UniProtKB/Swiss-Prot annotation:
Bias (Polar residues) ranges: 140-181
Span list, region Disordered: 108-196
Protein name: Small nuclear ribonucleoprotein-associated protein B
Gene: SMB1
Motif (Nuclear localization signal): 105-132
Assigned keywords, A-Z: Cytoplasm, mRNA processing, mRNA splicing, Nucleus, Ribonucleoprotein, RNA-binding
Length: 196
């Protein structure tokens, strides 16, 4: 563990972006960058790694009568990468500062301001897009000759289901024409529908 100088009276609010080692009631240790906390001491750790001693290794930790105090223990600790993690405050025993943040407070403030400006810019652009109606571009005269016949073919469904079995395109054009009145259909109740 590296020794980091932190004020004795520092609180969790002062330790945001610091790398912390969190001990829990079940004996597990979580190491990660503190991102947020709340009044219940629920912690959000970024790039979190979980370390725990497996049950098979617990016997080596228990003191034995025949062993001497100077013996070294070969205990294998299991590590697991968790990523972004929320720890329940009810389970937390203590927190220890592992490492200082990568950026100083001033650099973090500058970074946060930049991120805030970018977010505001994106929301402003999104709102402007929603306000403006979609632009309809007029095709070039050179391209219009090639695309006009293709667009008509695409707009008209060729299935016999739509044109009633005959290949008369003119009969089906009113369906895609905005000037034609909308067709009204008789109400067909679904199966099991009862009128009151």
């Amino acid at each position: 563990m590296s020794k980091i100088q932190v004020a004795h009276s520092s609180r969790l609010a002062n330790l945001i972006d610091y790398k912390l080692r969190v001990l829990t009631q079940d004996g597990r240790v979580y190491i990660g960058q503190l991102m947020a906390f709340d009044k219940h001491m629920n912690l959000v750790l970024n790039e979190c790694i979980e370390e725990r001693v497996p049950k098979t290794q617990l016997d080596k930790l228990r003191p034995r009568k025949d062993s001497k105090d100077g013996t070294t223990l070969n205990i294998k600790v299991e590590k697991r990468v968790l990523g972004l993690t929320i720890l329940r405050g009810e389970q937390i025993l203590s927190t220890v500062v592992e490492d200082k943040p990568l950026l100083s407070k001033k650099e973090r403030l500058v970074r946060d301001k930049k991120e805030k400006k970018q977010a505001q810019k994106q929301t402003k652009l999104r709102k402007e897009k929603e306000k403006k109606p979609g632009k309809i571009a007029k095709p070039n005269t050179a391209n219009a000759k090639h695309t006009s016949s293709n667009s008509r073919e695409i707009a008209q469904p060729s299935s016999s289901r739509y044109n009633g079995g005959n290949d008369n395109i003119g009969a089906n054009r009113s369906r895609f024409n905005n000037e034609a009145p909308p067709q009204t259909r008789k109400f067909q109740p679904p199966p099991g529908f009862k009128r009151k």
